[in-house]
């Protein structure tokens, strides 16, 4: 699936970026002065973590419905090209991007200039998966001595060890790094378990007639996490609070629409990515699953983050020595988790 597709809207945004840069070249970092001088929309760059999928639906819904335009913003989507969105945002090459709580925590602990501004999914959306006919595997505790098909995520092996240990096992298994080939390796029996995204690869497996048995991390006492986040460049956020608020609120509206009408949102996602996403039934099923089970918190709200949620997974990452400084040395004490996220841009 590592194909890169640039929609017509993305190409158009690139042209707008060039024009906006020309018009506002004398405006500097003062967004109010720039707007009054040129009346041009502000360009905001958003980095994707993968080819477009239902994790990104709210972005495309907001584009399609003109929510960003209402906020005076032109969005330039930076397609996935093997560059980590966190790296692009930290370097100022994108204002916002998709991220994940574990990797975002590790990046910010080491000094990355990031802040999480919105939680797309409130809970883990990946689960441990084995073939359904593996009668010898009834819980993650049974994975000791087996082979894990991994993805080269810096936290994944210790996370799997933590899940196995939480279930009563030792966490002693072999990891082979396969990337997206891990799914085929599981289906063919070349690895014993992997971690599909249940609202995507889980549905794909079902459509292919592959029966899986899955185990949710939190069912065994492992801490929960925000599976998908939107992070912003912290310096840019502080320098451009009005644009940041306009962008985040427009984006949140798109995701909220995706919860309220998953089928319509899935159709928009497909329309905005012509030729790339061809299976509408799968898109609708995936979007419905996310809307029902993952995108809203216990109060029925979208996007909100809490310090407790950050600190619970953070404690595991700290104890596992996955949080290091910019020299790679494990931190001596936990970070101030409240500094890693903000809800302020969701509020008027």
Model features per residue range: what roles?
Residues 1-13:
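Bacterial N-terminal signal peptides that target proteins for export
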Residues 21-25:
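C-terminal motif of bacterial Sec signal peptides marking the signal peptidase cleavage site
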Residues 27-30:
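Bacterial signal peptide processing site
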Residues 33-178, 183-188, 192-196:
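Short, glycine-/small- and polar/acidic-enriched structural segments
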Residues 57, 122-128, 226-230, 234-235, ...:
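Small-molecule pocket liners
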Residues 102-103, 181-276:
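Pocket-lining segment of extracytoplasmic ligand-binding domains
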Residues 239-320:
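Secondary-structure end/capping motifs
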Residues 310-348:
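Conserved C-terminal helix/tail region of periplasmic/extracytoplasmic solute-binding proteins
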């Amino acid at each position: 699936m590592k194909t890169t597709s640039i929609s017509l809207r993305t190409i158009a945004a690139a042209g707008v970026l060039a024009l906006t840069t020309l018009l506002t070249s004398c405006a500097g970092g003062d967004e109010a002065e720039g707007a009054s001088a040129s009346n041009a929309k502000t360009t905001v760059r958003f980095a994707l973590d993968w080819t477009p999928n239902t994790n990104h639906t709210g972005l495309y819904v907001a584009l399609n419905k003109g929510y960003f335009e209402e906020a005076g913003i032109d969005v330039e989507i930076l397609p996935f090209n093997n560059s980590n969105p966190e790296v692009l945002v930290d370097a100022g090459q994108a204002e916002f991007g998709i991220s994940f709580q574990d990797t975002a925590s590790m990046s910010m602990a080491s000094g990355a200039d990031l802040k999480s501004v919105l939680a797309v999914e409130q809970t883990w959306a990946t689960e441990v998966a084995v073939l359904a006919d593996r009668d010898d595997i009834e819980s993650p505790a049974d994975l000791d001595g087996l082979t894990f098909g991994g993805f080269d995520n810096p936290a994944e092996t210790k996370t799997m060890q933590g899940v196995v240990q939480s279930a009563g096992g030792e966490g002693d298994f072999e990891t082979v790094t396969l990337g997206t080939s891990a799914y085929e390796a599981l289906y063919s029996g070349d690895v014993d378990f992997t971690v599909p995204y249940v609202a995507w690869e889980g549905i794909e497996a079902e459509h292919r007639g592959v029966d899986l048995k899955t185990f949710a991390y939190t069912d065994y006492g492992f801490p929960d996490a925000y599976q998908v986040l939107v992070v912003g460049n912290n310096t840019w956020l502080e320098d451009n609070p009005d644009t940041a608020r306009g962008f985040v609120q427009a984006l949140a509206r798109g995701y909220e629409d995706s919860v309220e009408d998953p089928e319509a949102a899935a159709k928009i996602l497909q329309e905005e990515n012509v030729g790339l996403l061809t299976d509408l039934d799968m898109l609708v099923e995936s979007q419905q699953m996310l809307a029902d089970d993952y995108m809203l918190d216990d109060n029925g709200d979208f996007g909100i983050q809490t310090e407790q949620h950050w600190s619970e997974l953070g404690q595991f990452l700290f104890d596992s020595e996955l949080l290091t400084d910019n020299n790679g040395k494990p931190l001596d004490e936990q970070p101030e988790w409240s500094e890693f996220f903000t809800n302020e841009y969701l509020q008027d």
